[in-house]
Amino acid sequence: MKFALLALAAVALASPVTLDERQIAIPENELRTGPCEPITFIFARASTEPGLLGISTGPGVCNGLKLARPFKVACQGVGPAYTADLASNFLPQGTTQVAIDEATDLFKLAASKCPDTQIVAGGYSQGTAVMHGAIRNLPDNVKNLIRGVVLFGDTRNKQDGGRIPNFPTDRTKIYCALGDLVCEGTLVITAAHFTYTVNVPGAVAFLLSKL
């Protein structure tokens, strides 16, 4: 069954996510406010998700990384300039330039504040557009620090040829569920768009394999 895009807010908050996956209390601003860690995870949440990491794939991947590498991971969500509002999905880049700039600044902050860190990143839904827009234009010295990127329900998948432009495909993992039409270049939201928590363990394993 297809849902109108404007129904995304209600459905997103009702999507099936367990309490453990939500990790509501998990830190999400550690790059800005905490010490440097060997691994820095930067994530852009889906439209309507609260906080900086959201309540689904973002905290799930963050928690998975922290469990695998205790006391070695800093998690950072994109925001508050990135508001994850619905209307921004209709813009030419699939999000706002303000959001892209904020993500760009976070990657640059990780590189300048923590030059020895290994960066991994991700995005879900509109957050994938944020990552496409930011990573493609990063200077090489920053881009080279990004070891892996995971994208869930990629709204730029078709437009950008199944990859992040100007970034190695072997460091990118795009998850597009069967029947998720946003991966086909539309903004038609189906139930498949809310199934990506099942891909969190695989995404964590992919990122760890790149470190």
Swiss-Prot record:
InterPro entries associated with the record: AB_hydrolase_fold, Cutinase/axe, CUTINASE_1, CUTINASE_2, Cutinase_monf
Disulfide bonds: C36-C114, C62-C75, C176-C183
Compartment annotation: Secreted
Any single GO CC term annotated in Swiss-Prot or TrEMBL for this entry: extracellular region
Protein name according to UniProt: Probable cutinase 1
Native organism: Aspergillus clavatus (strain ATCC 1007 / CBS 513.65 / DSM 816 / NCTC 3887 / NRRL 1 / QM 1276 / 107)
Site (Transition state stabilizer): S47, Q126
Annotated family: Belongs to the cutinase family.
GO annotation, biological process: carbohydrate catabolic process
Keywords assigned: Disulfide bond, Hydrolase, Secreted, Serine esterase, Signal
TM spans (from-to): none
Location of the active site: S125, D180, H193
PROSITE patterns, sorted: CUTINASE_1 (PS00155), CUTINASE_2 (PS00931)
Organism superkingdom: Eukaryota
Source species taxonomy: Eukaryota, Fungi, Dikarya, Ascomycota, Pezizomycotina
